[in-house]
From Swiss-Prot:
Residues 151-153 are annotated as: G5. One of its GO terms (biological process) is ribosomal small subunit assembly. This is GTPase Era. Residues 13-20 are annotated as: G1. It comes from Staphylococcus epidermidis (strain ATCC 35984 / DSM 28319 / BCRC 17069 / CCUG 31568 / BM 3577 / RP62A). InterPro entries: G_ERA_dom, GTP-bd, GTPase_Era-like, KH_dom-like_a/b, KH_dom_type_2, KH_sf_prok-type, P-loop_NTPase, Small_GTP-bd. Disulfide bonds: none annotated. Residues 39-43 are annotated as: G2. One of its GO terms (molecular function) is small ribosomal subunit rRNA binding. Pfam families: KH_2, MMR_HSR1. Monomer. The keyword Membrane applies.
Length: 299
């Protein structure tokens, strides 16, 4: 009988290298927020990939960056603390970019870690194959990796091969989650992340990191309909105007796009109510950060 493998794998890397895209690809559902704006992942989002012979729990850590406020401090602590909890580390980089100071900082952080470390070169669909080997040699000059795998999370290229390699390094173990469970976050959290993703896609550079989303109420009204009441928090009146848009058009579009994804997630019709409120300087208010769902694990 084939042994069953299971383990926890941390995905670490600079902002916007494709970590969330990878999680959504291997899980087959939208769990992690995807956006072209940096630093969009705020909580450790655990996606559970279950196969007949293995179960892998992926922890999508916030992108490494220099913190600018209390929320940023929190995001960095989550990323670093994750390294002590896992069976393997995926260090993901954008192969279409030069090695940056952020990459060097992460490799310095990883040098003393005993856990198996895989260098995952993402976005190979954007580069010529001839450029891969020089890039691999560059990274190898910084540190030794357990293995180096080029992939495209967006296109799915080489992803299955990487999963097979990863499985071979994981210990024998049980299924930690039921077959049909794809995340350890409550549905309310995933819903709030979907809404935040749509806002990021539809608003300008000024807005992204000033956005907080809280699901105030989520109730099943009947067998085929869920009512969701949500508050979107911004830091300034001008940002509130941008999110709402002229005549409420922007907010309406956010609701329309979010509802579509939420209905797929829940398998029910959704009535989605969105409110926008100003909470000045909320990213520096620790209690408020906790209130809207960014909570550190307690030992």
């Amino acid at each position: 009988m084939t042994e069953h493998k299971s383990g926890f794998v941390s995905i670490i890397g600079r902002p916007n290298v494709g970590k969330s895209t990878f999680v959504n690809r291997v899980i087959g559902h939208k769990i992690a927020i995807m956006s072209d704006k940096a630093q969009t992942t705020r909580n450790k989002i655990q996606g559970v990939m279950t196969r007949d012979d293995a179960q892998i729990i992926f922890i999508d850590t916030p992108g490494i960056h220099k913190p600018k406020h209390k929320l940023g401090d929190y995001m960095m602590r989550v990323a670093k603390n994750t390294l002590s909890e896992i069976d393997a580390i995926m260090f993901m980089v954008n192969v279409n970019e030069d090695i940056g100071r952020g990459d060097e900082y992460i490799m310095e952080m990883l040098k003393n870690v005993k856990t198996p470390i895989f260098l995952v070169l993402n976005k190979i669909d954007l580069v010529h194959p001839d450029t891969l080997m020089p890039k691999i040699e560059q990274y190898q000059s910084y540190m030794d990796f357990t293995d180096i795998i080029p992939i495209s999370a967006l296109e799915g290229l080489n992803v299955d091969h990487f999963i097979d390699v990863l499985k071979s390094f994981l210990p024998e173990g049980p299924k930690y989650y039921p077959d049909n469970q794809i995340s350890d976050h409550p549905e309310q959290f995933v819903v709030s992340e979907i809404i935040r993703e749509k806002i990021l896609h539809l608003t300008s550079e000024e807005i992204p990191h000033a956005i907080g989303v809280n699901v105030d109420r989520m109730i099943k009204e009947d067998e085929d309909r869920v009512r969701i009441e949500t508050t979107i928090y911004v830091e300034r009146d001008s940002q509130k105007g941008i999110v709402i848009g002229k005549g409420g058009k922007k907010l309406k579009e956010v609701g329309k796009r979010a509802r579509r994804d939420i209905e797929m997630l829940l398998g029910s019709k959704v009535y989605l109510e969105l409110w926008v409120k100003v909470q000045r300087d909320w990213r520096n208010k620790v209690n408020f950060i906790r209130q809207i769902g960014y909570v550190e694990d307690q030992d």
